[in-house]
């Protein structure tokens, strides 16, 4: 059975698009007999589909900072050893920033979803942080508007957009 791992900061926002999309995909994957796994810092939606075959692992990735960066990376490496995903889907900048190098080091196919027009692309440091969402083997843009935004600020990744 193939294992698909989705990663996002939290499952707190009941009406959040990232959260809702993650859970909808997780449920669909489980229904299609994939091993569907989510990593987040938890939240009221974390156990929503547990009974439908979706598993959730908690790592505190909703708080930015150097201490949390190293703590979450250590836990993530252990979970990767345990889960052995066939595909990783990262849905937010901070988890992408923290985990991309480990995903790529293990040569796990890697997808990101670019959910918004992250501000600050005029600032070199902020643009570098925003660019972590283009590190996937493929980049899912949630709309034509977001697709155009990515092409404008990161034209070198246009062939990775789906």
Predicted regions and their residues:
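Extreme N-terminal starter segment of soluble prokaryotic enzymes
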Residues: 1-5
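N-terminal strand-loop element at the rim of the active site
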Residues: 7-15, 21-68
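Alpha-helix capping/helix-boundary segments
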Residues: 44-45, 94-95, 145-147
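An amphipathic, basic-hydrophobic alpha-helix
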Residues: 52, 62-88, 97-101, 105-106, ...
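Short His-centered aromatic/hydrophobic patch
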Residues: 90-96, 114
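A conserved, positively charged/aromatic
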Residues: 111-140, 155
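A short, active-site helix/loop in glycosyltransferases that binds the activated sugar's phosphate group
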Residues: 136-161
């Amino acid at each position: 059975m193939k294992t698909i791992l989705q990663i996002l900061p939290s499952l707190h926002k009941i009406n959040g698009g990232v959260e809702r999309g993650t859970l909808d995909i997780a449920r669909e994957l489980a229904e299609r007999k994939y091993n569907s796994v989510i990593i987040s810092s938890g939240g009221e939606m974390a156990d929503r589909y547990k009974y439908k075959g979706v598993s959730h692992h908690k790592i505190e990735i909703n708080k930015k900072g150097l201490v949390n960066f190293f703590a979450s990376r250590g836990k993530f490496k252990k979970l990767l050893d345990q889960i052995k995903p066939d595909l990783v889907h990262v849905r937010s900048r901070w988890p992408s920033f923290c985990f991309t190098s480990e995903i790529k080091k293990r040569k796990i196919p890697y997808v990101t979803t670019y959910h918004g027009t992250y501000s600050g692309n005029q600032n070199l440091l902020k643009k570098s942080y925003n660019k972590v969402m283009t590190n996937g083997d493929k980049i899912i843009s949630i709309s034509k508007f977001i697709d155009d935004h990515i092409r404008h600020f990161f034209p070198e990744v246009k062939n990775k957009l789906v």
